[in-house]
């Protein structure tokens, strides 16, 4: 089980790096690295299904190979995640106590939409 887990991580890493290079934005490879590390650290081995990993690798390969809907979805995901991380670092300094809940819940609809797309197409986004 651990070997399959490591193999899935490596497959997603390779496909993700190829897709990040195709977006032509230097910070995207770091975002993919952080997303993969967090995903594999937070969930145990039984959480991952081989079918979902294969579908996600295919999705990332399609995003890397041509300018398609997959490419646009991935580019949007990486952009938002990157700017979200930057905004999170400044959140404590630039917002008041009343504004913080608003800033923290601003991406709830976006996360729900990503989860829904991942469920429909059987992917890890």
Curated annotation (Swiss-Prot):
Entry keyword Mitochondrion: yes
Biological-process GO terms, alphabetical: mitochondrial gene expression
Any one cellular-component term (Gene Ontology): mitochondrion
Superkingdom: Eukaryota
Subcellular location: Mitochondrion
This protein's UniProt keywords: Mitochondrion
Family as reported in the entry's similarity comment: Belongs to the UPF0593 family.
Protein known as: UPF0593 mitochondrial protein C806.05
Annotated source species: Schizosaccharomyces pombe (strain 972 / ATCC 24843)
Lineage summary: Eukaryota, Fungi, Dikarya, Ascomycota, Taphrinomycotina
């Amino acid at each position: 089980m651990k070997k399959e887990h490591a193999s899935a991580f490596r497959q997603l890493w390779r496909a993700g790096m190829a897709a990040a290079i195709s977006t032509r934005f230097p910070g995207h490879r770091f975002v993919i690295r952080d997303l993969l590390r967090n995903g594999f650290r937070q969930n145990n081995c039984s959480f991952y299904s081989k079918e979902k990993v294969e579908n996600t690798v295919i999705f990332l390969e399609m995003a890397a190979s041509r300018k398609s809907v997959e490419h646009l979805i991935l580019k949007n995901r990486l952009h938002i995640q990157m700017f979200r991380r930057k905004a999170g670092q400044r959140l404590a300094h630039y917002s008041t106590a009343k504004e913080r809940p608003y800033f923290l819940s601003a991406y709830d609809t976006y996360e729900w939409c990503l989860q829904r797309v991942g469920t429909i197409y059987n992917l890890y986004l």
